[in-house]
Swiss-Prot record:
Protein known as: Protein SQS1
Basic residues biased stretches: 1-22
Entry keywords, A to Z: Cytoplasm, mRNA processing, mRNA splicing, Nucleus
CDD domains on file: R3H_G-patch
Stretches with biased composition (Acidic residues): 146-159, 435-456
Lineage, uppermost ranks: Eukaryota, Fungi, Dikarya, Ascomycota, Saccharomycotina
Protein's UniProt keywords contain Nucleus: yes
Family as reported in the entry's similarity comment: Belongs to the SQS1 family.
Organism the protein comes from: Kluyveromyces lactis (strain ATCC 8585 / CBS 2359 / DSM 70799 / NBRC 1267 / NRRL Y-1140 / WM37)
Amino acid sequence: MAKRHKHYNARGGGKSKSKKSKPHGESRQRKNHRGGTSINRNRSELLLGGGDLMNPHQVEDYYFGSTAKKSSLRSGGFRPGRLTEADELDTGRLPSRKRPVEFIKAKELYDPSHDLILKLVKKNQHFDEPNSDGYNSSQSVSLREEEQDGEDEQQDVDTQEIPSKNTTVKIRSDNVVSENGDSESNSSANDAELFYVDMEGEEKTADNYIKTVDVDVQERSLKLNDCTEFQPTLRVGNVELNLKDGGSGSIEVDKPKSSYHPFHSYIQNVMENVQNYDSDDDFDENGNDVEQSFSISSDYEFESSEELITTGGTIEQFDSSMKSLTIEEIPGKTITASLTTKDISQGNSDNSSGDESFGFCEDDFEGSIGKVFVSNIRIGAGTHSYHVSCHEIYGDSEPRWVDDEMMNEIIAEMGLPEHRFRAYYKHLHKSFIEEEEEPEEYADIPFDDDDSDDSTADQCEPFAEDDLGEDLDDLVSYALKYNKQRKIEYHTTSLDIRGKGRNKHLIFDQTAGMDEDIKLMLQNKFATRQINKTKKRRAKEDFLSQSHASSTDLLMKYPYGLHIQNIKDEFDAFYRNDRQSITFPPLDPHGNKIIGKFAYNYFMKASNIGKGKSTKVYVEKTKKTRFNKPAYHIISQLLRKRPVFMRIDQKAPTDTQSTFNRTVRLKVSKENFNISEGQIVGEDAPEIGIDNIGRRMLEKLGWNIGQGLGAHGNQGINEPILAKVKKNKSGLRHTSENQQ
């Protein structure tokens, strides 16, 4: 019989075996055992209060549902006391995006800022009082207006009683303010029927009395421009003015009291240039020195900045005063300068004290300038830079580059007077910049006259001409004599070479007719040339190996092969450094497999790249490499296996192969292993030598050659027992003599 599938059970034929299948027809309404249909309590339109509260099944069906599963999340989905229509249940099953949106108009106007403003108005009532100046602040006026608007909008609260049998309920009702400002009633019923107004009120008792406490509040005068802060300085472009608050909104400007002149710095620079003036062009046409003196005269007296402002002085006055400054040539060697200002006279006095070299003045030791360390100076076209380190200023000993202005602030902070700045900078420049030495001029050395030179030249000329002529004749005669031999061409041939490595030698032709001495000499020269080539090649390889010893490229570092310990060292270095990948030289398949095992135990990833003899192992780090330690117990086992791995893409020389300690087979002749019948064992063994320790002990005990090893009277045999080789199976008594 064919097997029926489960979907046949839901077709109504036969008894349903599936729990999920539903019968056809009126299956949604459960039939009562009395013949009627039971009401679906989940879709009941009656409140639970109208039902039977004593029936636990009805309460359970209402809250949790009888058709729902025990573990269903839909149980308890209805609120008590709510009507559940069929439409609401249908919409409840829909997703949120498909449910209809309902808009409900609020019964009250929600305005939290309005109540907050009213509280602030009551709290700041003392601002409404007039100030000492006789006017009210704008803030108090605005707050009062807002308070009046709030009082107009606020409505009275009525306490109403709804008559019932035994209870009275007080309801606080507020009118709803529409968008146009008109009040609308919540119902169309009459006020007399809905509300009850208590006209008597409540009696005032002692408990309802609220005690009030008078608190003295300090009056605060609010200014019109209270938001503006007073700043003591005013900057306009590059000009900075000091201000004072005069009160009552007035501001005063502080004028500088110190004397100031716009050309003060210019005149001071001119005077310094005049004092330091030194020129090499002060010579006339005949080479005599021209003595000059300069005099700078000025009849203008400097005024303060206040006098300039009051008198309304202009720049033209200063231009006329500058015209009076003249430089005149006066015979004399002294340089004179006359100035009427006090500032320049003081500056000259400072310069006189500042001309002393740094370290020879008492002012140099007033501060702690020795804590400023200057390690280098960069000289520029306009400004210089200094490499300075000062723990007192920066809090550390690290040097940094600073400019001239910052350097002046540092040395001033360390206590060096201003008039010693120049000497300090000279001291720094002399310590770092070496003065160029002028080349020596030999102007004082007298030269010979022309007459003496002519006389010496006349004496040398005849001798030189005679020698030159003789040499030319000899040279011409020698060239003509051997001219024919120079054009002769000689036929050269190279000798043949036979052998490899150290066995290379020359092959001489018997028809060449060479002597034995010449042949031996050529053989020695050829051997020397081969040795020199080998030395040069080894020197080149040693140089390359030393240069690539610290290289990260293993193909250059190991040109012929590497040891098992080298592989471990490379993995250790790669594990500690910041590189992410490494490539090993191409080895044989077993060597590449060993490198893969090393990578696995170091928690790295190994992959083969290339084909054939150029197959290399590419190793890269992974996330596990950082958080795991290598398995050194397994790595130590790998070190005990195959020690040497040669590269398969390079052919190593014979001398290099010996450096890897390769095992070499010994070529032993096979004759020693052929043992014949009747051969005496140890027949060819040598006699025990004198160096043997056992023989020397016996000789000290009195033993001599030819004696036995026994005691006196029983020395034993003098010769050892001979042992013969027996290879056939004929027996011990069978010998070759018996066969005969």
